[in-house]
Regions:
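Auxiliary Fe-S-binding modules of radical SAM enzymes
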Residues: 1-5, 160-235
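Short secondary-structure capping/turn segments at boundaries of alpha-helices and beta-strands
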Residues: 1-4, 13, 54
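Canonical Radical SAM [4Fe-4S] cluster-binding loop centered on the CxxxCxxC motif
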Residues: 6-42
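Conserved alpha-helical substructure of the radical SAM core
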Residues: 31-61, 65
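Short glycine-enriched, charge-decorated loop/helix-capping segments at active-site entrances
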Residues: 32-36, 128-134, 202-210
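Conserved AdoMet/S-adenosylmethionine-binding subsite of the radical SAM
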Residues: 52-64, 68-69, 73-193, 199-200
Length: 235
């Protein structure tokens, strides 16, 4: 658990990293979270007792707790109960997810104030190429978010030569505009911080040799995205 995160939702936030993920994204920087095993075992009530210690910081900054991963949706019973207890304690809740769980989303979203939705790609073909999995489950999750009427911040990783073209950004914007209650779109630059983990774990890193995205290029992509989200240059 990261106690005072500043980039995983509004305000000062505790970030709870949960084990397990079915996706094998080419740019994943946390391969150590793929397996459901490992990490620290803790009960929802015990976790929320730890989170309560930072309640004054959450309140003053407009923050709260963000459940991330891995993919937190793969532990639905734990997640729903932890979110419920957070809400009872007056802690604002946020879910950082790619939307690929077991289809059990209603109880989770009932206690979620904000979804940070990681859009891997906007076409089935591109999604399969990036993640190794079909797009079906994440679309089910989007439908559940729509039904629950939970606001959403969209995030998307921009990789040089893969997802940084103007055509891609415009297509992404068209897709994002179909999503429910999108309040913000953040383009994240591809980085190399997780590459060493692959070497340590004896895994092949499929983007070996691809450079990190420059901040200048990321800003240019973000500017185009912002214009498209306003209805400009989106064709």
């Amino acid at each position: 658990m990261e106690s005072l995160g500043l980039v995983d939702g509004p305000g000062i936030r505790a970030v709870v990293f949960m084990q397990g993920c079915r996706l094998r994204c080419k740019y994943c920087h946390n391969p150590d979270t793929w397996a459901l095993t490992g990490g620290e075992t803790i009960a929802p009530a015990a976790l929320v007792e730890q989170l309560k210690r930072f309640l004054p910081y959450y309140v003053r900054s407009g923050g709260g707790v963000t459940f991330s991963g891995g993919e937190p949706l793969l532990q639905p019973e734990f997640l729903a109960e932890a979110l419920r207890l957070c809400k009872e304690a007056g802690i604002s809740t946020c879910l950082d997810t790619a939307g690929v769980g077991n289809g059990e989303y209603a109880d989770i979203l009932r206690y979620t104030d904000l979804v940070l939705y990681d859009v891997k790609h906007y076409t089935p073909e591109g999604y399969l190429e990036i993640t190794g999995q079909p797009m079906t489950e994440t679309l089910r999750f989007v439908d559940a978010v729509r039904s629950a009427n939970v606001p959403m911040w969209v995030r998307h990783v921009v990789v040089p030569g893969i997802t940084d073209s103007e055509t891609h950004i415009r297509g992404l914007a068209r897709y994002v505009r179909t999503l429910p209650r999108v309040e913000r779109v953040e383009l994240l630059g591809y980085h190399l911080l997780g590459v060493e983990k692959y070497h340590t774990m004896g895994l092949t890193y499929s983007l070996e040799g691809v450079p990190a995205l420059s901040e200048e290029r990321r800003c240019a992509c973000q500017q185009l995205m912002d214009e498209c989200m306003k209805g400009e240059q989106c064709k």
